[in-house]
Amino acid sequence: MTSTRTVPRPTLGVLRLRPTMRGRGFVVGVVDAAGPDTNGFAPKDRVAWRAGGEQIGELVLREQRDVLGVPHWVTDEQVVSYLGPGLIARALVRTRPFGRGDDVRVESSDPLVAEMTAAWARSLGARVVDTKADLAIRDDLRSRRAVVAGHGRLAEGAVEVFQAIRRGVFDSVEPVAPATSRVAA
């Protein structure tokens, strides 16, 4: 674990963050301190950022551009469970336009992405089917690249995922077990 003394004060455009939970590609935590010229973030704000695979200490430094604000009505469990797969589901739903009442088949090798994409399609009025359909929404590399194309798109996508969580779109989708996701006390 990294102690408070070994993590320096944040510099220009950098945030010092205290992680609270990690899962499915994202870490959620709170702002511990904000460096000069950081706009929109203050100490104790809830935030999320992409997990880089590194060991996470008690405090970490991240560029402000790599951090997303988390609304107060979204839990840590919802962020780590739904944000990553939700961004992919959002991109998949946007790849093929469909209308209310259309039959849609969802194809993904990731069961959680398939379940979340189906839930999102149903919330937009589609009938999700396992057989022949008006169109198929396929989880492929091109669609996933749309998710990671840039921070502006990531931030915009995160807002839509958080709104879908608030509307209850993913209520039927089981979250990640929180006991395996905790990173800090």
Language-model features and meaning:
Residues 24, 28, 82-86, 114, ...:
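Short alpha-helical patches at coil-to-helix transitions and adjacent helical residues
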Residues 83-142:
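Mid-domain Rossmann-like dinucleotide-binding core that forms the NAD(H)/NADP(H) cofactor-binding site
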Residues 122-123, 127, 131-132, 142-152, ...:
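NAD(P)H/NAD(P)+-dependent Rossmann-fold oxidoreductase cores
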